[in-house]
Amino acid sequence: MPNPNQTIVVRLRNWVGDVTLAVPMLQRLADAGLDLRLVGKGWARDLLAGHGWPVQVLPKTMAERVRLLRDMGRDARRDGSLNGLCLPDSFSSALEFRLAGLRALGHAWEGRSLLLARAVPRPRGVHELEVYWRLGSALLGQDAALPAAIGLHLADSHLAQADGLRHKHGIEPGCILICPFAGGTWNQVDKTWPGFADFVARDLQAFGRRVVVCPGPGEEAIAQAQFPSALMLPGVGLGAYAALLRDAAVMVSNDTGPGHLAAAVGAPLVSVMGPSDPALWRPWGPTVQLLGGDGQWPSAQAVRAAVARTLLGR
């Protein structure tokens, strides 16, 4: 097990869902006394602000990334112990740690074993949260039971931003949030529920609640065209988004990052999955109702019933 206060430079992954699912492992390392120094996408700093970990923005070029990793690890121990944690499985991410002179732990994947100070097999057939949890166990040298919930911390600034949005747009408590978007595909199959627009127009409006959508960059036109009845809040940061979710009556989401975000703050979530494998990628937590998956989309009636169970208790 690393010594208390030992500096560990952590390279985060590039998707909101992945970073969210890694939060319990990162908090476990911090609770063990490790000095975490994170590097990832620009949005990760806002997402993780409530935990107080410093997050550097990942540069675009390899030379800049190596220079940044070297600077971040300047205070790390150089006695042969591990001082890096590489969460991505790419060859380049392991190479950057090696060129920066850091001894990183990561998955034995794509011929990376010679670049990492310690390479462990990537588990197959387990949920992605457990994949990261096991990496934390390997770093600490001890196993621990999987957490029941993610427990994403919100910063005071996140709560203030969410309050400002509610006041500005007249959003009352008990609204419904939707995330009808989906980044990427599953085995080259679109993860966007084909019935989402009709469901919002015909079924969700019947509950008499304000419906809110927070499109990400490039999603505004889809939100406006396909979900005209919803209040659109573009440009909302992930921290404020999480704070809005925490106080929502329910969220209905595709298999995408904001769905994991809702589960991470304990919001009631109806997770609509189609091609994805729920055993590997379902949102994690006790407030999740999972519908579909493994190549099957749920019916609108099933999604409506799940929303009704949350809102009406039946």
Cite the ranges covered by each PLM segment.
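Catalytic machinery of carbohydrate-active enzymes
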Residues: 1-314
